[in-house]
């Protein structure tokens, strides 16, 4: 009954006094919808869309990493990129920086199996296996601006025995969280909702659907689709777009004694821009990518392709 709707109730309250006014705030108004557009055409006081919000630097910069890889290689990619961020933070005196990875599956059984596979992968890491993985990665790169060039260069100049020891400590079984257990929130509601705290050791989260709604974590930097199917379902990509939007929230870390709530390094020569980027690791399948981009566009999420930038060469005078 229309008389019982929230909208009708508000209108009735407004009509009680001629000087009543209503201010409405929303992040999801669909002005492209004809009915909604007609209703709000003369009522919008100020419009600040998500895409503009992201363009103005109030979010992480969302980067798509598309590759046809097996799950093991994809998980190792995410770990090496995540640890690269931590190394860059340490190089620049940024303390307590702990980037989190989300491994997203479509079935609980797969998520649990992949967590076990992940633990085995971390335990089996050696300097030789990392060098081999990065050498294969370098051969596959088709762009001079891919983040992987910097990642490969950083590890090439590092003591891999030490780095791998740090990775194995950071990603040990105690620092992995599987949120598919029905009793998780009763057991330990704190771990999932305090990932930004320095005393929370979790570096990787394995999930199916529990983090799609109402989960806000600012230090999520990598979202990895594992055992994904080459589906071009709009419903599925809409859900992914929503998750990407959540992961894009900016993490206001302190650098050079100053805390910022907007991006500072988009155009900087420093490697610090990676601390302001969310990487979404997914398959390189044309139909799926087309549908994903449509969902991201519909959600007003500004995305960039890894390696789509331009290499600038400065000329010395």
Regions found by a protein language model. Give the residues of each.
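Helicase-associated low-complexity regulatory tails and linkers flanking the ATPase motor
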Residues: 1-25, 30-204, 218-222, 228-317
């Amino acid at each position: 009954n229309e008389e019982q709707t929230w909208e009708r109730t508000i209108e009735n309250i407004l009509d009680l006094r001629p000087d009543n006014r209503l201010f409405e705030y929303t992040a999801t108004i669909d002005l492209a919808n004809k009915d909604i557009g007609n209703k709000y055409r003369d009522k919008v006081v100020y419009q600040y869309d998500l895409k503009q919000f992201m363009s103005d630097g109030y979010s992480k910069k969302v980067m798509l990493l598309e590759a046809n890889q097996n799950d093991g290689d994809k998980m190792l990619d995410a770990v090496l990129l995540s640890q690269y961020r931590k190394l860059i933070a340490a190089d620049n005196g940024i303390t307590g920086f702990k980037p989190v990875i989300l491994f997203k599956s479509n079935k609980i059984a797969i998520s649990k199996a992949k967590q076990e596979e992940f633990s085995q992968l971390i335990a089996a890491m050696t300097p030789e296996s990392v060098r081999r993985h990065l050498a294969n990665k370098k051969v596959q790169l088709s762009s001079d601006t891919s983040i992987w060039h910097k990642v490969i260069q950083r590890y090439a100049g590092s003591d891999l025995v030490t780095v791998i020891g740090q990775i194995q400590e950071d990603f040990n079984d105690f620092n992995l969280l599987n949120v598919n257990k029905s009793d998780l929130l009763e057991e330990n509601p704190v771990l999932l909702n305090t990932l930004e705290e320095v005393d929370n050791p979790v570096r990787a989260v394995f999930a199916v659907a529990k983090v799609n709604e109402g989960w806000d974590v600012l230090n999520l930097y990598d979202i990895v689709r594992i055992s994904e199917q080459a589906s071009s379902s709009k419903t599925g990509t809409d859900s992914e777009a929503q998750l990407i939007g959540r992961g894009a929230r900016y993490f206001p870390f302190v650098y050079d004694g100053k805390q910022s709530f907007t991006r500072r390094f988009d155009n900087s020569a420093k490697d610090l821009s990676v601390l302001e980027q969310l990487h979404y690791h997914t398959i390189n399948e044309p139909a799926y990518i087309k549908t994903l981009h449509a969902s991201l566009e519909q959600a007003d999420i500004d995305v960039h392709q890894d390696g789509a930038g331009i290499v600038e060469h400065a000329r010395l005078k």
